[in-house]
Amino acid sequence: MGDSSVTKRWAKASATIQAAANKLLWDDRAKLYRDNETTTLMPQDGNVWAIVSGLADTPSKKKQISAALAKRWGKFGATSIENRNYVSPFIGSVELWAHGIAGDNDAMLKLIRLQWGFMLNDPRMTNSTFIEGYDGNGVLTWPGYPYDQRVSHAHGWATGPTSALTLYTAGLQILSAGGKTWRIAPGLANLSRAEAGFQTSLGKFSVSTKKGSRGEVKVSFSTPAGTSGEVWIPKPNCKAMLSLGCKGQKSRNLPMWDKGYPGSTDQYLVVDNIPAGNWQAEVKCVH
């Protein structure tokens, strides 16, 4: 709304809450947050939101929470121990985002195949839409509903894979309003290719990524005029060179073993200040 007068006050309150939660609620043995100071319950919803909201204060905690949640999965999906071990595709969708934010794209894809695969393939389903929720044993009931047929079989809150695959597998992310700034950060895990795209008030965004057997990557992406962003390229299992080029501009060749680029890590080469255009980034092993 353009009102920044209370920004500092709320930022301070947020930091205070984060510090208190990490001091009082983090269980270092379980690698999860407790629901409150008076219980041993470590809920699915609270822990996935700890990652998504930024309450988890280190990258290692995010990875630990992601791994601990994955250990809880049942035969039909991610159960909510705080909700009588029912499976909630709503909070399960948020769990997908949490795995993506934590950098565990493999866990994200496994949960999609497990939980949403069940919803698509079970003969009691529509085989084209997603259900509101169900018992952890696969029975199609939901707490508070006296009749089984009351469960919605076309439920908007169960559509998390759409955004999760766009944001963390294809890696098409907008960082500010309308996509004025953006990030391309593909995370294919065990997939060989991914594509995504959408349109905002500023124009069309799209990305297409293909991966070779040794981790070689070819990323083509397009962003609208007046925007800028950054590209995160996963480093392959070889000594590699990144070629980054845009239609109408001279290509750049960057050694992927060089950490001299701002924001680069052992896993990613990060190139920032990229203007809008039709770009292609290609990673090739040099030996």
Give the location of each predicted region.
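Catalytic cores of carbohydrate-active enzymes
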Residues: 1-146, 254-268, 273, 282-284
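Non-catalytic C-terminal accessory modules of carbohydrate-active enzymes
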Residues: 19, 106-287
